[in-house]
UniProtKB/Swiss-Prot annotation:
SUPFAM superfamilies: RNI-like. This is Protein phosphatase 1 regulatory subunit 37. Residues 16-29, 514-531 have a biased composition (Acidic residues). It comes from Mus musculus (Mouse). Interacts with PPP1CA.
Amino acid sequence: MEIPPQEAPPGPGADADADAEAETEEASAEAESPTGTSPPADGRLKAAAKRVTFPSDEDIVSGAVEPKDPWRHAQNVTVDEVISAYRQACQKLNCRQIPKLLRQLQEFTDLEQRINCLDLKGEKLDYKTCEALEEVFKRLQFKVVDLEQTNLDEDGASALFDMIEYYESATHLNISFNKHIGTRGWQAAAHMMRKTSCLQYLDARNTPLLDHSAPFVARALRIRSSLAVLHLENASLSGRPLMLLATALKMNMNLRELYLADNKLNGLQDSAQLGNLLKFNCSLQILDLRNNHVLDSGLAYICEGLKEQRKGLVTLVLWNNQLTHTGMAFLGMALPHTQSLETLNLGHNPIGNEGVRNLKNGLISNRSVLRLGLASTKLTCEGAVAVAEFIAESPRLLRLDLRENEIKTGGLMALSLALKVNHSLLRLDLDREPKKEPVKSFIETQKALLAEIQNGCKRNFVLVREREEKQQLQLSASMPEITITAPQPLEESGELPAVGSQNGAPRPGPGPDSDSDSDSDREEQEEEEEDQRNQQRDEGGNDQSSLASCPALIPSTDSLGPGDKSPPSSPSSPTEQRISVSSPGRGHKVFVVTRVESPPERPEPPVPPTFVSSPPPSPPSPPASPPSQTMDTQDPESSEAQPQLEPSQAGQPLPNGLKPEFALALPPEPPPGLEAKGGSCSLEHALHRSQGVSKLEELLLEASQEAPRDTL
């Protein structure tokens, strides 16, 4: 290492050694330098270049510390543990315990989910008391944390907001009526608003947000915030705080409700900021500006923003803002352009009759307003007539408030006539007591008109409820169901629709055109088709001979409808049995039974159709059951005996030596309720086949053994 000149030891040869060393270093520097730069002007040379080496990748990280889990204390916690931890914290911090909090903790039951409310309203919370609350917040979460009027100072508010942000303690937070949280309190609140993803509702009524605190809140609302509802009533927002807030909210897409009442907002700068906010923000749904000083000039700015609101704002409250008929002209021009505004409250403004006339045309052109507030707006009978014209023209108006106005007999008569035409208005608020009239009989007329108006609203309410019930029925009709369309007259006459046959050969299952919407039906259909193929392969050419020897199997053309003469595969056959299966999200399918066979005519009156019939044996009677019905319950293993089983008649032994008692082993007769399911033979086949397999096998075995003796 080079020794500085002031530290070099004195000696006669010191200067010579220093010069020699300097020349050596200069030569080495020039050799190593790729550019060959000249030495500095002062003659001093830099030291030799230093090299830096790094350890291997495995040795770079010597250790790691995981972040603390805020919920490590909240697993399987009990009420006693929470109370004990809170009391220990109070003793450690030497602060008083809150009896109201202890009572609420003892009432909590389900600690795994968010608890409905933690109510600390009216309790005085200093810094130490707030610090003790951390033992509760680290173990429990709440939906609502109510800190209204708790006398929070900057330190206590900062501590509480940090806890709520870290532990995500609340979705709804009320900090209203805390006038001393100061700048640090608002800074912590802004950090909480920005970082807490679960916080949706913040109530800061009567909590001043001054010039030096507003930038923090504005920054939190502009960057990202999960807040959907923000109450800032009486927060001293007029001026710069409102400008910062409105500018930030132009880019906020999450806030839905903004309440700015009682902030002394003026009709110039403040209203201009609100108008610009409405131009750029289309996600805000409720804007409450009651009890401010918007005036007609400010309403002009707001209406300019409303014209740009193709969608977004749903409720606008302008209650008590010194608006007159001049401002109603601006609003009347803006209303035809709004497509989302549903509630407009203009109460307690001296609008007068002229203002309502200026507003009427805009309201008629507007098709979105459902609720209109005109309470205490200096209206008389003349203004009520203009309102009645709007009622008669409106197909959507639900509620109208006309209280605290001098509406007498003439105005009530106009409103009553308008209600006879209107079928949407459900509530019309009027003063209960009739107004004084020079003619005493008019007072009774007013009472009668008031009753008639109320009856008209009740009538509309009944109509709306009927429409809702009809819509509910239509909705329920779209639920999963199986319905039979185009019922056949054959069912009414007692004839049984059987499965179709093709080319004169009976078929044991549904036709190939049939289909269903469920997987189980598809599996049953595949099984039945496999059985059919096995039957046809085993029978071979015996079908024609068996049919020729059994004329009873050939149905008479007189018993069939005219549509039965068409081929089974014809989709236009009028006797097709269509069964529709509908299910929301799974589509709509229709399967068709293309052939309908009926039993031979009987001398006795027709009986309800059954799949299996076993009457007492008598020689002259027709067959006991249609052959297709008997085959529906037959097992595939007995397909060899199938041609001989078909001509079974009462009073005669069955072919192949089967006894007449064979029919007794068939599945029991279905209940009468199954008559309506005439087209679902495949389902009946699947149900009965599994029940009668064992009995059929026993009878067939017995018949095969006794056949020689019976035929003799």
